[in-house]
From Swiss-Prot:
Coiled coil: none annotated. This is Kunitz-type serine protease inhibitor stephenin-1. Expressed by the venom gland. Keywords: Disulfide bond, Protease inhibitor, Secreted, Serine protease inhibitor, Signal. The lineage of its organism: Eukaryota, Metazoa, Chordata, Craniata, Vertebrata. Disulfide bonds join C31-C81, C40-C64, C56-C77. The record marks N41, A42 as: Reactive bond for chymotrypsin. Belongs to the venom Kunitz-type family. InterPro entries: Kunitz_BPTI (IPR002223), Kunitz_BPTI_sf (IPR036880), Prtase_inh_Kunz-CS (IPR020901), TFPI/VKTCI-like (IPR050098).
Length: 83
């Protein structure tokens, strides 16, 4: 294979790595936990990663003592669990 072909292959592999979503083996284990509103009653909007649907979803968060699969923004959820 020519050096140009190798360079093209390397570029395509790099692009593939960047565009490929986080696989379940690279995702933190806490992303598999269910939505947890916690014991408090503030009821604010939060996000959690749903491993069955492979996306971040809204849920009502009580405001305290939730599990680590609880995010203030959908962007934070995606960056951590679904990116």
């Amino acid at each position: 294979m020519s050096s140009g072909g190798l360079l093209l292959l390397l570029g395509l592999l790099t692009l593939w790595e960047v565009l490929t979503p986080v696989s379940s083996k690279d995702r933190p284990e806490f992303c598999e936990l269910p939505a947890d509103p916690g014991p408090c009653n503030a009821l604010s909007q939060a996000y959690y990663y749903n491993p069955v649907q492979h996306k971040c979803l809204k849920f009502r968060y009580g405001g305290c003592k939730a599990n680590p699969n609880t995010f203030k923004t959908i962007e934070e959820c995606k960056r951590t669990c679904a990116a």
